[in-house]
Amino acid sequence: MLRDIINLLKKDNLQAQALAECHEMLSMCEQMVAASVESLRRRDDATVDVDILTMDKKLNAFERDVRRKVMTHLSLGNTSDLTAGLVLISIVIDIERIGDYSKNIHDLATVHPDKLHGGSLEDDVAHVERDTLEILSRASKAFTEGDEELARELMAEYKDDISGRTRDMERALVAEGVITDSRQATALALYLRFLKRISAHARNLASSVVNPFDRIGYPE
């Protein structure tokens, strides 16, 4: 799978342009996630440093353009690029969804304008938050540079750390009621779910570096 993607970098065609757009989308997603987290967790007025809505619309336009370029390229008979084209169509969905979840976090900030604190779960919330930002950055690097070793590390870390820790906190919030303020508990539950989904889509991106097309999003 990695070889198919790397080969695109050596070409100048519609599919290579689609790959470049995926790289640009990833850069935008990193900015959007970081800014939305800052807005929710560290500001009392929900201000955000980038235009989340405009960037989200641009991501949507990029997604459509990637699909269109891949379809056009393959329809011209470039069957040797079929696998790479299928990969791009698959992962561009994950990239666009990361943008959607960053918008969800910002939307949460606007209805919860106070800084969102994790209460007794703060250390764990902060841990998942840091890991999510890091896994997104490293997944982007693994995909852009074709780093198989880094991709494998990220796939293992998501399952061992983010997924399990988030599940434990969700249980504490819902079953054990460790946060008694319903507004805070609801906001935390939503935030954790958004972070978990961002991490999962980043993991899918990493899996595209090492897995065949039919196993993207699954263990190697």
Segment roles from a protein language model:
Residues 1-220:
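Cytosolic, long alpha-helical scaffolding segments
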